[in-house]
């Protein structure tokens, strides 16, 4: 019974993570409901599993502390007259509670090497299929998502995402899995070739998306993976592997030929009319004004779209729903206290994650943790210029990867209740 419930939990987490991107990134109300209800159902299954066992074993995670403190901060904002818009804070609190549940359950479920390896392979297969769909839609598409749904967003759509940068965010988190599996010593050579091919195709679609922040984050990922994988070893092999991957990627890009990619980067040098065509820097400047007015606890979780128009320094007939910088938006909505907890989360993520990856080459579980840590790195870098953590599908995957990167596989680390 317990084993069956364990399988249900692991499969359920993977299905929820797979559902989000296919549902246009999980940004619509019905998709958010599925994510929240699915997370609650999985928590109930875990509780039933605990009742069926003679004792409940809970695997601790260092990130539980900043997450619980952050939950307490949001709970304080739900008190009367604490949030600029109580309902928006409540809605976002429910969504992030779902992320917290997925984080907790992932820590409990994915603690054995075999399950971690399966998760890494599942991410590879899923990412490859989504990438192939995106390439097909790019070259034989009709301007509609899934060839059926018109794109009403202002941004270019790629794959199932209405925003090309959010598609890049998904691939940033998934590409490290085939990359690490291709470099690991436990994979046979034919499988390494397949993993390498999947990584090249998935990586090429980041360039196909023409997301400048995504391309920069992907480049940082490759560099970080090269450095982390070479810890305690000769670096020549890791550098050669990274160089070979880049050459294969360039060859793939020559075949795919993303139209307008160079022009996208050339736009960075264009003069900006802050009054009518603001840049992300303008959004950040306006957001910092908001922080100065409520520096301690912020305006309320999820209230940025409501409060920002009062501080906007430019004219637009479009709704500005995010700061295009997740860290700045965190400071706006939860103040310096929430920002400090976010920094603590990132610090503990890397301190704990880097302590786990010493023997990644011959341990499938540790190699998956390495890939998860690199995936989190990519999204964190991208978050300086975009709002991927405001996209439910990407945020849910980020927190699951954080759980895998920091979770313990040691039997002695569990606590009994």
Language model features by range: what are they?
Residues 1-3, 7-26, 33-47, 71-78, ...:
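Alpha-helical transmembrane segments of multi-pass inner-membrane proteins
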């Amino acid at each position: 019974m317990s084993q069956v419930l364990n399988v249900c939990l692991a499969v359920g987490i993977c299905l929820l993570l797979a559902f989000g991107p296919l549902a246009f990134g999980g940004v619509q109300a019905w998709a958010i409901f599925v994510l929240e209800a699915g997370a609650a159902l999985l928590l109930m299954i875990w509780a039933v599993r605990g009742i069926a066992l003679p004792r409940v074993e809970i695997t601790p995670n260092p990130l539980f502390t900043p997450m619980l403190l952050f939950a307490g901060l949001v709970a304080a904002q739900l008190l009367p007259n604490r949030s600029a818009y109580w309902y928006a804070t409540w809605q976002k609190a429910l969504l992030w509670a779902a992320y917290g549940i997925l984080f907790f359950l992932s820590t409990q479920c994915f603690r054995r090497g075999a399950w971690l390896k399966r998760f890494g392979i599942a991410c590879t297969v899923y990412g490859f299929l989504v990438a192939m769909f995106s390439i097909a839609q790019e070259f034989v598409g009709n301007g509609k998502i899934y060839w059926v749904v018109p794109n009403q967003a202002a941004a270019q759509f790629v794959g199932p995402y209405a925003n090309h940068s959010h598609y890049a965010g998904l691939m940033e988190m998934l590409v490290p899995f085939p990359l690490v599996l291709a470099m690991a010593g436990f994979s046979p050579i034919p499988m390494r070739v397949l993993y390498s091919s999947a990584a090249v195709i998935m990586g090429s679609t980041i360039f196909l998306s023409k997301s400048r922040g995504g391309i920069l984050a992907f480049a940082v990922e490759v560099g970080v993976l090269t450095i982390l994988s070479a810890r305690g070893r000769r670096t020549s092999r890791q550098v050669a592997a990274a160089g070979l991957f880049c050459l294969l990627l360039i060859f793939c890009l020559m075949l795919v030929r993303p139209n307008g990619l160079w022009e996208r980067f050339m736009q960075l040098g264009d003069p900006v009319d802050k009054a009518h065509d603001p840049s992300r820097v303008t959004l950040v400047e306006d957001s910092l004004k908001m922080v100065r007015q409520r520096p301690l606890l912020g305006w309320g979780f999820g209230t940025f779209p409501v409060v920002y128009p009062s501080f906007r320094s430019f004219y637009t007939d479009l709704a500005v729903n995010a700061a295009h910088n997740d860290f700045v938006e965190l400071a706006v909505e939860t103040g310096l206290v929430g920002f400090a907890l976010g920094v603590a989360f990132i610090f503990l993520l890397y301190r704990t994650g880097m302590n786990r990856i010493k023997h990644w080459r011959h341990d499938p579980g540790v190699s998956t943790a390495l890939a998860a840590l690199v995936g989190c790195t990519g999204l964190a870098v991208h978050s300086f210029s975009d709002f991927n953590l405001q996209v439910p599908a990407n945020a849910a995957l980020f927190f699951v990867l954080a759980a895998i990167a920091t979770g313990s596989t040691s039997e002695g680390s569990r606590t009994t209740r």
